[in-house]
Amino acid sequence: MNHNELFEKSKEFFENRDIQNTLDHYQQAMERIDRTKLKNKSDYIQFLQSILKYCRENNLPEQEALVLRALGRTYSLFKQHAEAMKFHYQSLKLQKKLGKRVEIAEGLVFLAEDLEVSGNYDETVKVFREASEIFQELGKLRKVKEIKREIERLTEFSKEIVEDEYFLNKFHVDNF
């Protein structure tokens, strides 16, 4: 199925109030989306907003947290990272309240990815470490290893930035 078919299938599931399948198919649609050909970004946001409204009106906090995360991922995909972080934080707050450890760790990884884009590398590493600790406790060692590689990459990149700044200042490169 292509992304449009998956998105339509997701809408069908929502009409039947099957939130889990709605979100599963929505996520699959987002994984197959071609941002260069995307014209109707607001359709995706409005769709998720209507699911969020339904979840809140029907007191479905677990699904609400997943919809908030989907909103965060969607905004991130659309390169609206500040908006994405807002929804990631809301989702994490709810996931923590619900005690959903796997979802918390996954949400932290998504948040870290958006923090990295903002240039806040120290906070990114901190959030990645928090996710890694949870994955470690859950025995998800592959995830721990992936995060470790990300932290090493960010740490090295951060070090390079500091060195570059030092040399720019030392040799007054900005004055030319």
Model region roles, listed by residue range:
Residues 1-176:
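Intrinsically disordered, low-complexity regions
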